[in-house]
Amino acid sequence: GFPKGVMLTHHNITNNGYCIGQCMKFTENDRVCLPVPLFHCFGIVLGIMAIITNGGCAVMLERFDPLVVLASVHKERCTALYGVPTMFIAELNHPMFSMFDLSSLRTGIMAGSLCPEWLMREVMDKMYMKEITSVYGLTETSPGMTQSKVDDPVEVRASTVGSDLPGVEVRVIDPETLEECPVGVQ
């Protein structure tokens, strides 16, 4: 489609990045591997802003290549990794996957589309990302609106959009009546 102009303030993107990083418990000891593009909010806000506002380090890759990602995590001892589900599938299925030590990983973000529970479990088990989260958002919301918690059960991380981030108000509207739904309605 056509590009859209979206007005984002410095406060919006800084605060959103900070809250994303806090949700993943980033500290100055964290190193995030970013194989996602920086021209998109996923890379620049959820990635760069999240890690620098929480004092950590970004390991930036020129483009996505599963072998380069695995080698970078291994060499740089990254503690976090970002991607969309298909990127994680490509990494897990790479023929050289078992040659890399990924035990430094603990968290990250899987976003961009629905994450099947089986994939979330494989990433947690085979890539050691026990605290991986999912984020839902829009460019217009700077971009994160909701995020799962690092200690949410895997079923919650894979089947929901998580909880609203600080400063975000969420309402669920009945599409037929356009009325706000009471808490607990499904």
Give short role names for the model-derived ranges.
Residues 171-186:
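Conserved beta-loop-beta connector loops within the AMP-binding
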Residues 5-7, 34, 56-63, 133:
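Short beta-strand->loop structural element characteristic of the AMP-binding/adenylate-forming
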Residues 65, 86-88, 115:
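Alpha-helix capping/helix-boundary segments
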Residues 14-31, 39-80, 94:
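Conserved AMP-binding/adenylation subdomain of ANL enzymes
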Residues 1, 55, 112, 137, ...:
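Conserved G/P- and acidic residue-centered "switch" motifs that form tight phosphate/ATP-binding loops
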Residues 70, 75-83, 92-156, 169:
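Gly/Ser/Thr-rich phosphate-binding loop
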Residues 158-164, 180:
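Short Gly/Pro-enriched turn/cap motifs at secondary-structure boundaries
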Residues 1-15:
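Conserved AMP-binding A3 loop
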